[in-house]
Amino acid sequence: MFSYDFMQNAFFVAICISLLCPCIGIFMVLRRSSMIGDTMSHASLAGITLGLLTNTNPILGAFIFTAICGALIEFLRKYFSHHLDLILTIILSLSIGTAITLISSGKLKANANVFFFGSILTVNATDMISIAVLTILSVLTLYFLYNSLLYIAYDEEAARVAGVKVDFINYIFAILMAAAV
């Protein structure tokens, strides 16, 4: 089975993703915002369609749009802290609506379904390198911010009083979530 290059590539990417996702996911669950993953994945759909529409790299488009949505979620969460579920629903609806509108326009340069429902078996060397770099950078960032992220996850106000740069770390974490999606 591992004598085929595509299986080796798929196995390597699966290992990288299986290292990255739990490291980020644990903080999402601790912050009681596990639905943010669903919102970010729908935001990536809109980013992919924007990338295809502008004839740029759809993966880059997905990252940029998802990072913007993550930053928007954090910005709105600061002002409407008790309404995270409402914020996530609004961003999710905005993202899915944007994706459907762009797909329905008929102006996409490629088939969006190829990117939506891809296969891990079709990963190439460029994808492997970018996923490995992303995993290493994200895990290192989480390692260095671990104590602050844990403090914020349990009591954001106490972390703020203790001198933790809560807003800055929340924005970094939003970008890490966007990159993982």
Model-derived regions, located:
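Helix-loop-helix "hairpin" substructures at the membrane interface of multi-pass membrane proteins
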Residues: 127-181
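Generic alpha-helical transmembrane segments of integral inner-membrane proteins
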Residues: 15, 19-23, 64-72, 98, ...
